[in-house]
């Protein structure tokens, strides 16, 4: 199993701003998000974070986010450790 780190920008629509999506990533996908920057307001929000974990789990977490109407933009390369 290979561990990876991806840097992403997550953009939340108004309907998803109040959800604890990073907590869900930890519990459901066994990945570790590390918030680098964020701007969350009542009607919109974004988070730049690194997500560490096993490659298949990180990809599953990103797909889940996309399915929840959260825009996922990859920032830079995927780093393997």
Regions found by a protein language model. Give the residues of each.
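Long, contiguous binding/interaction regions
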Residues: 1-81
């Amino acid at each position: 199993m290979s561990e990876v780190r991806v840097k992403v920008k997550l953009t939340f629509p108004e309907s998803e701003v109040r959800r604890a999506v990073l907590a869900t990533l930890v519990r459901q996908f066994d990945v570790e998000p590390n918030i680098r920057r964020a701007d969350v307001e009542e009607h919109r929000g974004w988070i730049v974070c690194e997500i560490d974990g096993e490659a298949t789990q990180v990809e599953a977490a990103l797909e889940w986010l996309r399915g929840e109407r959260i825009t996922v933009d990859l920032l830079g390369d995927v780093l393997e450790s």
